[in-house]
Swiss-Prot record:
The keyword Oxidoreductase applies. The gene is gcvP. GO terms for biological process: glycine decarboxylation via glycine cleavage system. It holds the Pfam family GDC-P. The keyword Oxidoreductase applies. This is Glycine dehydrogenase (decarboxylating). It comes from the Bacteria. Its cofactor is pyridoxal 5'-phosphate. It is an enzyme of class 1 (oxidoreductase). Keywords: Oxidoreductase, Pyridoxal phosphate. GO terms for molecular function: glycine binding; glycine dehydrogenase (decarboxylating) activity; pyridoxal phosphate binding. NCBIfam families: gcvP, PRK04366.1. InterPro entries: GcvP (IPR003437), GDC-P_C (IPR049316), GDC-P_N (IPR049315), GDC_P (IPR020581), PyrdxlP-dep_Trfase (IPR015424), PyrdxlP-dep_Trfase_major (IPR015421), PyrdxlP-dep_Trfase_small (IPR015422).
C-alpha cells in the first residue's frame, strides 16, 4: 500500500473488496459500471487538466509556504470585521473536533440534542443582548441578514400597505457599504424601492414600509435612534437595526426602543477573521413575526416520555415544503460558527463580556485622548470602539503600512481606527507613534487606560443579560471542556458511522484539509486588507477558481456565495443581468422540474422570476415534451431552466442535451444545480451537458464539513457569455466588468474554508478526483444491489444503474402501519443517521453513501435496513406498540426497573451483534414535533425545567 497516496486514505473500499462489490452489482469492472451509468454523449474523452496529486506531507509544506506569503498587519479597519481571541478550549474541542464539524443539520433531533442545546444557547445570547423576543440559529453573514430583514418587513406589511403597494425601504447611509450593496442587489427584483440617505433628514413618508440603521454607524458614531424609531412607529414604518454584538454589552438594547428586527454578526465572539469568513450572523425579532423568520429556529418540545427535548421548530416555513412561497431560500446557515460564538459567551459569561467590552472601549477613549494631544481632531461625539480622525489619508496610509498597520480611510482627509479584543497598550502606542510621525511631534505613551467614557448616559445599557445558568457555570477550562464533551456525546456524526443523506454528500473531511484553519496566518487576515498583503490567500483563491472552472468545463468562477442557496440566487441574478445587457430584461420565466430541490423555486422568486413547473414522466425523468411545450409557450419571456444533474432521483437522464438545447433555442439560459456534482467530477461536467452556469456545494462535493448545518460555500461557475456579470464588492473590486452587486458581505465569501477544497483537489489530483467519483457511483450501486430483494428502488437509468444516490420506496409499508419516519427512527437504534426522508418523493428514503465509506461500513448499513425490513414484516396494521413505532430506544428505557413492551430489551437496543461493541445511545426518545410548534420556546428554559428531564 502506498502510504503517500491521499486517495487511498480518502476512498473507502479497498482493492481487495472491489471484485466482490462488482460481482454483487453484476458488472466486470468499474469501467463497465460507469459506461452503464453515464450517457455516452456526455462522457468526457480527456482527463481533467489539473496538476498531479500531492501527498499529505507535501501539501502540508505547500500550504505552510503559502501562508507565509500573507502579511498579517495589525488591522483596525473594522467595517463589521474585528480580530478576536478564540479560546483554546473552544478551538481544540469544537473547531478541531470531528464530533462537532462532521455532523449534519439536526433534522433527526433525537441524535442531535447536543448541538441543538448549543444553538439554543446561541439564540438565548442573541435575544438577551438585542433585547428581542426570538432569534434564529444563525444566518450566512451580516449583509445577508440585513437583506432578510428587509424582506421580512416587506412580507409583514399590513393589509392597507399591501393594497396601496407601499414599497419603499430606507437604509441609513451610515450602514456598512457591503450591506448596502447586497441589499440593493436583493431589492432589485423584489419590487422594493430602496432609498439610501441620512436618517436625521428622513421624512417618515407613508410611502415607506421599513427602515434600517447601523448601530453604531460605519464610522463608529453612536446615534440616539429613540426619536427615529418612535417617528417610524407613528408613520407605520417598521425598523431594523444592524447592531455590533459586542457593543450591545455596553449600549442600550435595540429591543428596548421597540425595534422590529435586529441583525448583525457574531464574528467578534472568538471567530477568526479568515479573510471574510465563515462567521455566524444573527437575526432577532418579535415573536409575532416567528413564521416569517428566515433560517432555522431551535425550540423546546417533549419526547414520548414527556421529557424535555429540543428540535428545529416551525419547519413548514422552509423551502423543502413551501418552495416558491418560502420565507427565504436559505438552507445552510453557520451552525459550527454559531456554536463557537455561543460557547464564547458561555465561557466568558456576562461579567467576562463586560470586561472585554470595557477594555475595548477604554482603549478607544485612551487613543482619542493621545491623538488629541498630538493635535488631531476626532469626529465622533459618541462611540464604542471606533474613532474617526481627521488626517491626510494618503500620507497616513504610507506611514502606517510602513509600520505594518492598517486603518480604514473613508475619504482623503480622515481615517477610522477600530479597536478590538486583541488590542494591547503596546498596540495603541504603535498607532500613536504613526500619528506622531505624521505630525512630526513628540508623543507620550499610554501606560494606563482612561476611565472616561464616550457613551452618553442615556445610551448606556441598564438591563441584565446572559442571566441563565448556562452562562454562569462554565468559566474554568475544565468545566467548559466537560460541558462541550457532554453535548458532543449526544450527537451522531461521521466519527461514529456513515451518514447516508441523499443530496448531502457526507464524505470524509480529512484532517490534512482541516489543519490549516487553525493557522493564524490564515485566520487573522481582514477581508478588506490591501490585496497585496494577502498574496497567500490570493494564490489559493485564484487557483481554486481555476480548478473549479476546469472541473465544470466553464470559463470563470466566483467564490463569493456563502451557501448553495446563495449560489443559486447568484447564478440566476447573473442570468438576469445577461438578459438585461442584451436588451431583454423582460425575460423572467424560470422553468423548474417538479422534482427540484425546494431552494430552486425559492431562489427563482427572490431573483424576481416567475416559476413555471415542468412535469416528470413515470420513470422520474423530466418530461421532455412538456418542457418543450412550456419553453415554446414562454419563448418571448423565457429566462432560464433550473435543472439538477444527475437528477434529484439519482439518475443521469439521457435526454439532458436535448433539454438544454430546447432552452437555448427559445432564448433561455440553463442553470445547473450542482448539488449532485459528486457524480460528475472527472467523468462529465455542466459545460458538457449544455449548461451555462452552475453552483457548486463545496461543503458536499469538495469536502468542506457540514458543521451541523454550516458553514457552506456555493461558488458559481459560468460560461464565457456570463463572465462579465460575476458578483462584485464595493470595498475590494471583484467580479466581472459588468458585475452584479454583492451577494455576500466579503469579496471572496468564506475564504478560510476554501482552503479545505483547495487541499482536497491538490491532494487527489486528476486521477484521484475521477476515482472518487467512480467509487461514489460504485458504493451507491452496491447498496442498491444489496437492498434489491428487500426494498424497491424507485428510479434507475436506462441500463438499470443509479448515479451516486438512489431512492428506496417505503410507501408500501403503510399497509402494516409503518411510516418512513418509523424506519428513520429505528435506524438510530442500529447506530445510523437516517437517509434523506420524503425528498424528493414523499414516503421514500434517498441514500447517498459517498466514496469515503468502506465495504464493511456499507454492509453494516445494508444489514441494518434488511433487518428493519424483517421487523416490518413482523408487525400488523393494528399493532402500534412495536419496535419501530417506539424507536429510538434510550438507555433510560433499557435500564428501567419496568419493561412493559412486547419485545425484549435485546431486540430494542441490540438487534445486530456488532452493536454490542459500538453502541450509540440517543439521549431522548422520539420528539413531539407538533407540541414544540404549539408551545414555541426558543431561548434556554429555566434550570428547573432541565431538572425535570
Amino acid at each position: 500500500m502506498r502510504t503517500d497516496s491521499f486517495a487511498l486514505r480518502h476512498i473507502g473500499p479497498k482493492a481487495e473488496n472491489l471484485q466482490e462489490m462488482l460481482d454483487t452489482i453484476g458488472v466486470e469492472s468499474i469501467e463497465q459500471l460507469i459506461y452503464e451509468t453515464i450517457p455516452d454523449d456526455i462522457r468526457l474523452d480527456q482527463p481533467l487538466n489539473l496538476p498531479k496529486a500531492m501527498s499529505e506531507n507535501q501539501y502540508a509544506e505547500h500550504i505552510k509556504k503559502l501562508s507565509e506569503k500573507n502579511r498579517v498587519f495589525k488591522t483596525y479597519i473594522g467595517l463589521g470585521y474585528h480580530q478576536a481571541i478564540l479560546p483554546a478550549v473552544i478551538q481544540r474541542n469544537i473547531l478541531e473536533n470531528p464530533g462537532w464539524y462532521t455532523a449534519y443539520t439536526p433534522y433527526q433531533a433525537e441524535i442531535a440534542q447536543g448541538r441543538l442545546e448549543a444553538l439554543l444557547n446561541f439564540q438565548t445570547m442573541v435575544s438577551d443582548l438585542t433585547g428581542m423576543e426570538i432569534a434564529n440559529a444563525s444566518l450566512l453573514d451580516e449583509s445577508t441578514a440585513a437583506a432578510e430583514a428587509m424582506a421580512l418587513l416587506h412580507a409583514v406589511r399590513d393589509r392597507k400597505q399591501k393594497k396601496d403597494d407601499v414599497n419603499k425601504f430606507f437604509v441609513s447611509q451610515q450602514t456598512l457599504p457591503q450591506t448596502i450593496s447586497l441589499m440593493e442587489t436583493r431589492a432589485n427584483f423584489l419590487g422594493i424601492d430602496m432609498v439610501v440617505g441620512d436618517h436625521e433628514e428622513f421624512d417618515f413618508s407613508e410611502e415607506y414600509f421599513g427602515a434600517l440603521v447601523q448601530y453604531p454607524g460605519k464610522f463608529g458614531q453612536i446615534f440616539d435612534y429613540a426619536n427615529f424609531v418612535e417617528n417610524c412607529k407613528n408613520a407605520n414604518i417598521k425598523t431594523a437595526f444592524a447592531a455590533d454584538i459586542l457593543s450591545l454589552v455596553k449600549l442600550q438594547a435595540p429591543g428596548e426602543l421597540g425595534v422590529d428586527v435586529v441583525v448583525g454578526t457574531t464574528q467578534r465572539f472568538g471567530i477568526p477573521l479568515g479573510y471574510g469568513g465563515p462567521h455566524a450572523a444573527y437575526f432577532a425579532t418579535k415573536e409575532e413575526y416567528k413564521r416569517n423568520l428566515p433560517g432555522r429556529i431551535i425550540g423546546l418540545t417533549k419526547d414520548l416520555d414527556g421529557n424535555n427535548a429540543l428540535r428545529m421548530a416551525l419547519q413548514t416555513r422552509e423551502q423543502h415544503i413551501k418552495r416558491d412561497k418560502a420565507t427565504s431560500n436559505i438552507c445552510t446557515a453557520q451552525v459550527l460558527l454559531a456554536v463557537m460564538a455561543g460557547m464564547y459567551a458561555v465561557y466568558h459569561g456576562p461579567k467576562g463580556l463586560e470586561y472585554i467590552a470595557n477594555i475595548v472601549h477604554a482603549s478607544a477613549v485612551s487613543l482619542e485622548d493621545s491623538l488629541k494631544e498630538l493635535g488631531f481632531e476626532q469626529l465622533n461625539s459618541a462611540y464604542f470602539d471606533t474613532i474617526h480622525v481627521k488626517a491626510n489619508a494618503s500620507k497616513l496610509k504610507a506611514i502606517a503600512e510602513k509600520h505594518e498597520i492598517n486603518f480604514f480611510y473613508p475619504d482623503a482627509e480622515s481615517a477610522c481606527i477600530s479597536i478590538n479584543e486583541t488590542t494591547t497598550t503596546d498596540d495603541l502606542n504603535a498607532v500613536i507613534a504613526v500619528f506622531a510621525e505624521l505630525s512630526e511631534k513628540k508623543h507620550a505613551e499610554i501606560e494606563e487606560l482612561s476611565e472616561r467614557t464616550a457613551i452618553p448616559k442615556n445610551l448606556e445599557r441598564k438591563t441584565e443579560f446572559l442571566t441563565h445558568e448556562v452562562f454562569n457555570l462554565y468559566h474554568s477550562e475544565t468545566e467548559l471542556m466537560r460541558y462541550i464533551k457532554k453535548l458532543e456525546r449526544k450527537d451522531l456524526s461521521l466519527n461514529h458511522s456513515m451518514i447516508s443523506l441523499g443530496s448531502c454528500t457526507m464524505k470524509l473531511n480529512a484532517a490534512s484539509e482541516m489543519l490549516p484553519l487553525s493557522n493564524p496566518q490564515w485566520g487573522n487576515m481582514h477581508p478588506f486588507a490591501p490585496v497585496n498583503q494577502a498574496e497567500g490567500y490570493q494564490t489559493v483563491l485564484k487557483e481554486l477558481e481555476h480548478q473549479l472552472t476546469e472541473i465544470t468545463g466553464f470559463s470563470a468562477t466566483s467564490l463569493q456565495p456563502n451557501s448553495g442557496a446563495q449560489g443559486e440566487y447568484a447564478g440566476l441574478m447573473v442570468i438576469r443581468a445577461y438578459h438585461e445587457a442584451n436588451g431583454e430584461g423582460h425575460r423572467n420565466v424560470c422553468l423548474i422540474p417538479s422534482s427540484a430541490h425546494g431552494t430552486n423555486p425559492a431562489s427563482a422568486v427572490m431573483a424576481g422570476m416567475k416559476v413555471v413547473v415542468t412535469k416528470a414522466s413515470e420513470n422520474g425523468n423530466i418530461d421532455v415534451d412538456d418542457l418543450r411545450e412550456k419553453a415554446i409557450k414562454h419563448k418571448d419571456n423565457l429566462a432560464a431552466l433550473m435543472v439538477t444533474y444527475p437528477s434529484t432521483h439519482g439518475v443521469f437522464e439521457s435526454a439532458i442535451r436535448e433539454i438544454t438545447n430546447i432552452i437555448h433555442e427559445n432564448g433561455g439560459q440553463v442553470y445547473m444545480d450542482g448539488a449532485n456534482m459528486n457524480a460528475q467530477v472527472g467523468l462529465t461536467n455542466p459545460g458538457r451537458i449544455g449548461a451555462d452556469v452552475c453552483h457548486l456545494n463545496l461543503h458536499k462535493t469538495f469536502a468542506i464539513p457540514h458543521g451541523g448545518g454550516g458553514p457552506g460555500v456555493g461558488p458559481i461557475c459560468v460560461a464565457e457569455q456570463l463572465k462579465p456579470f460575476l458578483p462584485g464588492n464595493p470595498v475590494i473590486k471583484t467580479g466581472g466588468e459588468k458585475a452584479i452587486g454583492a451577494i455576500s458581505s466579503a469579496p471572496w465569501g468564506s475564504s478560510l474554508v476554501c482552503l479545505i477544497s483547495y487541499g482536497y483537489i491538490k491532494m487527489l489530483g486528476t486521477g484521484g478526483l475521477q476515482q472518487a467519483t467512480e467509487y461514489a457511483i460504485l458504493n451507491a450501486n452496491y447498496i442498491k444491489a444489496r437492498l434489491n430483494d428487500h426494498y424497491k428502488t424507485l428510479y434507475s437509468g436506462e441500463r438499470g444503474r443509479a448515479a451516486h444516490e438512489m431512492i428506496i420506496d417505503c410507501r408500501p409499508f403503510k399497509e402494516q402501519g409503518i411510516e418512513v419516519t418509523d424506519i428513520a427512527k429505528r435506524l438510530i437504534d442500529y447506530g445510523f443517521h437516517s437517509p434523506t426522508v420524503s425528498f424528493p418523493v414523499a414516503g421514500t428514503m434517498m441514500i447517498e453513501p459517498t466514496e469515503s465509506e468502506s465495504k464493511p461500513e456499507l454492509d453494516r448499513f445494508c444489514d441494518a435496513l434488511i433487518s428493519i425490513r424483517k421487523e416490518i414484516d413482523e408487525v400488523s396494521v393494528d399493532d402500534s406498540n412495536n419496535v419501530l413505532k417506539n424507536a429510538p430506544h434510550t438507555i433510560h428505557m433499557l435500564t428501567s426497573d419496568e419493561w412493559k413492551l412486547p419485545y425484549s430489551r435485546e431486540k430494542a437496543a441490540y438487534p445486530l451483534d456488532h452493536l454490542h461493541d459500538n453502541k450509540f445511545w440517543p439521549s431522548v426518545r422520539r420528539v413531539d414535533e407538533a407540541f414544540g410548534d404549539r408551545n414555541l420556546m426558543c431561548t434556554c428554559p429555566p434550570t428547573e425545567e432541565y431538572a425535570e428531564a
